[in-house]
UniProtKB/Swiss-Prot annotation:
It is found in: Cytoplasm. Disulfide bonds: none annotated. One of its GO terms (biological process) is peptide biosynthetic process. Belongs to the elongation factor P family. GO terms for cellular component: cytoplasm. PANTHER family: ELONGATION FACTOR P, TRANSLATION ELONGATION FACTOR KOW-LIKE DOMAIN-CONTAINING PROTEIN. GO terms for molecular function: translation elongation factor activity. The gene is efp. This is Elongation factor P. NCBIfam families: efp (TIGR00038), PRK00529.1 (NF001810).
C-alpha cells in the first residue's frame, strides 16, 4: 500500500524494486535551505545487505503488505525466542536478529504483533512502553540541581537507564521500548 514517506518508522517493511527492506533507522532532516526529507537506513530481508535511501517527506513509498499475527511471548532459549499465536495456539520460534534491539524488553506473556511475508517472520512489533523494576540506583549527589539532573539506574532486565533523582531501587518505572528512556513512575 502507498503511504507518505514521513510515516515510515523503525521496524516497518518497505517494498522497492521487487525487494523487501526492513527499516532499521528513520531520521527526518530539515536542512536550512530546501524542503525536509527523511533518511531511511534499511536492511534487505533476503540477503541482509544494508542500504540507505532518502525521500522527500511528501513523497509516497510502497509499504509491503504483510500478514500480522497477535502473539504472546513464551520463553527465550539462547538467541531463539518462542511466541504463541493467540488464535491458533501454534508456537513459532523467531531468531533474535529479527526482533532487534527491543528483545531485552520482552517479558513472559507480553503481547506483540509478528509481521510475516509468505510464512517467514520479518519483524516483531513490541508495545511502545514496558513497566520494569529498578534493581540498582546510584545515590543522589546533592547540589547538582542547577540543571535537570538524572542518575544512572539498572533495571531488572539488566538495561541501564537515566532516571530522576527521586526514583530509587525497588521502584517500578515505565520505559520507552524504542529508545530505552525513562518516561514516568509506574502507576501501580
Amino acid at each position: 500500500m502507498k503511504v507518505n514517506a514521513n510515516t515510515m518508522r523503525k521496524g516497518h517493511i518497505l517494498e522497492d524494486g521487487g525487494k523487501l527492506y526492513v527499516i532499521t533507522a528513520a531520521n527526518i532532516v530539515q536542512p536550512g535551505k530546501g524542503g525536509a526529507f527523511i533518511q531511511l537506513e534499511m536492511k534487505d530481508v533476503r540477503t541482509g545487505t544494508k542500504t540507505s535511501m532518502r525521500f522527500r517527506t511528501q513523497e509516497t513509498v510502497e509499504r509491503a503488505r504483510l500478514d500480522e499475527h497477535e502473539m504472546s511471548f513464551l520463553f527465550a532459549e539462547g538467541d531463539q525466542y518462542t511466541f504463541m499465536d493467540k488464535e491458533s495456539f501454534e508456537q513459532v520460534t523467531i531468531p533474535g536478529d529479527v526482533i532487534g534491539d527491543g528483545k531485552v524488553f520482552l517479558q513472559d506473556g507480553m503481547e506483540v504483533v509478528v509481521q510475516s511475508f509468505e510464512g517467514a517472520p520479518l519483524s516483531v512489533e513490541l508495545p511502545q512502553t514496558v513497566t520494569l523494576r529498578i534493581v540498582e540506583a546510584d545515590p543522589v549527589v546533592k547540589g547538582q540541581t542547577a540543571s535537570s539532573s538524572y542518575k544512572p539506574a539498572v533495571l531488572e532486565n539488566g538495561v541501564r537507564v537515566l532516571v530522576p533523582p527521586h526514583v530509587d531501587a525497588g521502584t517500578r518505572i515505565v520505559v520507552n521500548v524504542e529508545d530505552g528512556t525513562y518516561l514516568e513512575r509506574a502507576k501501580d
